[in-house]
Amino acid sequence: MAELLECRNLTKKFGSKYALDNVSLTLGRGRIVGLLGPNGSGKSTLIKTINGLLTPTQGEVLINGELPGVESKRIISYLPERTYLNDWMKVRDIIEFFADFYDDFSTDKAYEMLERLHIDPKDRLKTLSKGTKEKVQLILVMSREADLYILDEPIGGVDPASRDYILETILTNYNENATLLISTHLITDIEKILDDIIFLKDGKVVVSGSAEAIREEQGCSIDAYFREVFRC
């Protein structure tokens, strides 16, 4: 059986600048993986390339052994870094739209998460705070039964008091046979849920492996090791 996700010698250039530089990695099934790096390290470029939103300069991405396309979009549930929803829509209208568009979307799960996060489905997006809009986007992503969930900075715009609740929402609502790839620079908040980590620096993978094994080998937390690797 093919790996769920495989990147082979992936390079992406914008002009003469390397956003990704010969990235090779594989993700199996049933793992929670942290894609970790400072701003500008190439995390979002890698995620967009995996989703087929950017074309690599060299190398390739394989999803279940196939290039990104219509079939890969059926099994990937993607949370982009920026809000993409129309402000004039009501939350319930967006849920109905996703339910019509995705066969694997659970309306019941979406409304359950709205209730737990105290979001009124009758509200229009333009009346919601930035953090609440991001919660709505997260709910939409986690209401699908996907094979691969890709979350780009899911807690970046959420206040610290809500972060644990957001992480609990992620953990209790994703398909446990699926893989969860989470991009973030907020290591302290998220390392407790990670099975594996990938450190991305200047578009290159500089560290990858089991989070537990790396903690044992380095004798410190992932956050402390991250600070050491990326020390200015």
Question: What do the predicted segments below correspond to?
Answer:
Residues 59-72:
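Conserved ABC transporter NBD signature motif
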Residues 208-209:
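ABC ATPase "signature
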Residues 33-38:
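The feature captures the beta-strand-to-loop junction immediately N-terminal to the Walker
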Residues 81-136:
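ABC-family P-loop ATPase nucleotide-binding domains
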Residues 51:
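Helix-to-loop junction immediately C-terminal to a conserved catalytic motif
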Residues 149-153, 158:
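Catalytic Walker B motif of ABC-type/P-loop ATPase nucleotide-binding domains
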